[in-house]
Amino acid sequence: MAINVEPALSPHLVVDDAASAIDFYVKAFDAVELGRVPGPDGKLIHAALRINGFTVMLNDDVPQMCGGKSMTPTSLGGTPVTIHLTVTDVDAKFQRALNAGATVVTALEDQLWGDRYGVVADPFGHHWSLGQPVREVNMDEIQAAMSSQGDG
């Protein structure tokens, strides 16, 4: 029997406390837990969530699964990746994330590219941008706005 495979791109997050991270993502982003797999020591070696209609995977920091290195944002001194969520009612969703324990990285504001946009850091060091299109903007307008920002 053939298995139907849907191509997908899913972030796989490494965190210091996957069970707490799942609780946070449920509160902050209305995530739905799809499942979790604990390892012999009780750490989660795999978990999957549905956020904004897409799968996000995560696990506890298990260095032996990562070439012997700790791979959490806290152990690495930050994260070079921001996960973006396009949402409706971005003000409410941004505040919900803050109420759940996220901190502001970039304040929520209307941006020159047409989105109301801001960035939060979750308690585990991962960055999440939230945006909502609020006006249509073409590339020429964006480039003109960027050029005018350089004048001054």
Swiss-Prot record:
Name the UniProt record assigns to this protein: Uncharacterized protein Mb0911c
Coiled coil regions in record: none
Domain VOC: 7-133
InterPro entries for the chain: Glyas_Bleomycin-R_OHBP_Dase, Glyas_Fos-R_dOase_dom, VOC
PROSITE patterns membership: VOC
Pfam families to which the protein is assigned, alphabetical: Glyoxalase
